[in-house]
């Protein structure tokens, strides 16, 4: 076992903006746990580390406040402050010189390892090398270009190259290392990089290997992400979701007012396909709440200001990991739910579009005026957030799914009480730099009264104007 481990967490994370606007990047969460806690667990549980040094810099006090002394984590945590984070990782490691006198593992704080085999590195505690680098085999050369490449002879590394332009093999260098204390001299003896003007750790190890140091490669298993950019963080969250998708619970939330003609059929349609159904009923006088209860739904019946208020009420009560929203008028079908959930593996929110003509059933409330009005309004939203390259064709479709953690991220910014709640959700997910995928869904004739929001051209214009006004205000930074 290794007595001491190290996690460098000093970086500013500027490339991860806006996620790092108020949160250090190592405290970003994937699957409900921060990157830092995940890596602390690897050092503690797989490598037997009892004491961990965190090299802090940017927002270091926030990290210290979040992690503490490690007493509640079963490991001792000590902090070393790096006064010049621009000096780079290698120089940051020099802070350890007076604290470490034996081989020690290092895991970079902005990396994610899932189901890894770090425990195999324990053999290097008994058979020490000068350096051990964790590597993975990959067919994705883009990942290698973002990290570093290695050249091997057996398990011995003969050279390393940071962010290579030419890929010579399928070995991806990771931010897991084991160093001997001699690494400190190697760092001090390495000149600054001609590319960056600072001493680069990869160049230190490469130079040392070519001088005859014993530098070994340990092949890591499991899933891995190096998180430097927003797309890396999104990829990491999607990776975690895919690995655990079968374990997630699905909640269906339905706002209702006088939906007695349809609510029973809606619940029957979805009951076997979700884990719970929450109905937020605006004290319907027609017995909607009683029918929903009889069909097994959890019903919240109280005065509600409108569609958006009812949905917020239902979402607050839902316990699922994936929250599915839809109407109680039977205009949507559970047959589309499997494909919505399939796309949730790769998105933070999946929204339906009712503008695919072939999927609009005869008699549905979607004439050319309403359909093309939705398309036009959706394109306005798409244009205003063009940097994120969304693709929208329907601003008002209320059949959608969102991850619970994504909803919690945007919840405090949701205030619309009426139908503008639907585009408001889209806007806030985009503002949070999260991913939305739109897919076509079947749209059927509504059962019950005509919608007061889309039952006439005047109602459509009023509703559309409110939606667009909200979108423009949010784009300009107003609430």
PLM-predicted stretches and their roles:
Residues 123, 153-225, 230-234, 402, ...:
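Catalytic-core segments of class I nucleotidyltransferases/pyrophosphorylases
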Residues 64-152, 321-354:
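Conserved beta-loop-beta/alpha segment of the NTase-like Rossmann-fold superfamily
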Residues 34-43, 256-273:
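Short, well-formed alpha-helical segments that are part of the catalytic scaffolds
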Residues 210-214, 218-250, 269, 342, ...:
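Hydrophobic helical membrane-anchoring modules
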Residues 1-7, 15, 29, 33-107, ...:
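Conserved N-terminal catalytic core of the sugar/cofactor nucleotidyltransferase
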Residues 146-155, 303-305, 309-316, 334-419, ...:
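Acceptor/aglycone-binding surface of glycosyltransferases and processive sugar-polymer synthases
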Residues 1-21, 241-254:
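N-terminal nucleotide-binding beta1-loop-alpha1 segment
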Residues 114-195, 355, 371-380, 398:
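Conserved core of the sugar-phosphate nucleotidyltransferase
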């Amino acid at each position: 076992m290794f007595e001491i481990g190290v996690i460098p967490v000093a970086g500013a994370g500027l490339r991860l903006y806006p996620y790092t606007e108020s949160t250090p990047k190592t405290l970003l969460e994937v699957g409900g746990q921060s990157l830092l806690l995940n890596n602390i667990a690897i050092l503690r549980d797989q490598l037997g580390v009892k004491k961990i040094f965190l090299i802090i810099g940017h927002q270091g006090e926030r990290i210290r406040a979040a992690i503490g002394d490690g007493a509640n984590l079963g490991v001792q945590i000590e902090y070393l402050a790096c006064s010049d984070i621009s000096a780079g990782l290698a120089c940051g490691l020099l802070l350890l010189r007076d604290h470490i006198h034996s081989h020690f593992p290092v895991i970079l704080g902005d990396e994610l390892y899932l189901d890894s085999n770090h425990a195999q590195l324990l053999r290097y505690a008994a058979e020490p090398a000068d350096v051990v680098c964790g590597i993975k085999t990959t067919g994705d050369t883009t990942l290698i270009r973002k990290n570093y490449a290695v050249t091997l002879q057996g398990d011995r590394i003969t050279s390393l190259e940071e962010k290579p332009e030419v890929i010579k093999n399928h070995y991806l260098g990771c931010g897991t290392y084991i160093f001997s204390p001699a690494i400190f001299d190697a760092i001090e003896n390495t000149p600054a990089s001609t590319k960056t003007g600072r001493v680069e750790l990869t160049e230190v190890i490469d130079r040392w290997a070519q001088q005859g140091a014993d530098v070994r490669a340990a092949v890591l298993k499991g899933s891995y992400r190096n998180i430097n950019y927003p797309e890396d963080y999104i990829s990491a969250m999607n990776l975690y979701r895919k690995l655990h998708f079968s374990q997630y619970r699905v909640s269906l939330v339905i706002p209702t007012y006088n939906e007695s003609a349809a609510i029973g059929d809606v619940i029957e349609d979805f009951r076997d396909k979700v884990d719970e159904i929450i109905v937020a009923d605006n004290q319907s006088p027609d017995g909607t709440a009683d029918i929903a209860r009889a069909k097994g739904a959890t019903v919240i019946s109280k005065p509600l200001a409108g569609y958006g208020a009812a949905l917020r009420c239902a979402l607050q009560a839902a316990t699922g990991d994936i929250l599915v929203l839809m109407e109680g008028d039977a205009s949507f079908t559970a047959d589309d739910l499997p494909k919505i959930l399939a796309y949730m593996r790769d998105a933070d929110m999946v929204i339906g579009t009712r503008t695919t003509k072939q999927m609009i059933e005869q008699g549905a409330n979607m004439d050319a005026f309403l359909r093309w009005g939705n398309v036009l309004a959706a394109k306005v939203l798409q244009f205003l957030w063009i940097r994120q390259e969304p693709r929208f064709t329907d601003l008002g479709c209320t059949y959608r799914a969102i991850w619970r953690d994504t909803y919690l991220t945007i919840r405090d910014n949701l205030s619309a009480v009426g139908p503008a709640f639907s585009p408001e959700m889209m806007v806030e997910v985009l503002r949070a730099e999260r991913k939305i995928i739109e897919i076509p869904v079947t749209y059927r004739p509504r059962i019950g009264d005509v919608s007061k929001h889309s039952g006439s051209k005047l109602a459509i214009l009023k509703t559309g104007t409110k939606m667009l006004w909200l979108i423009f205000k949010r784009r300009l930074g107003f609430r």
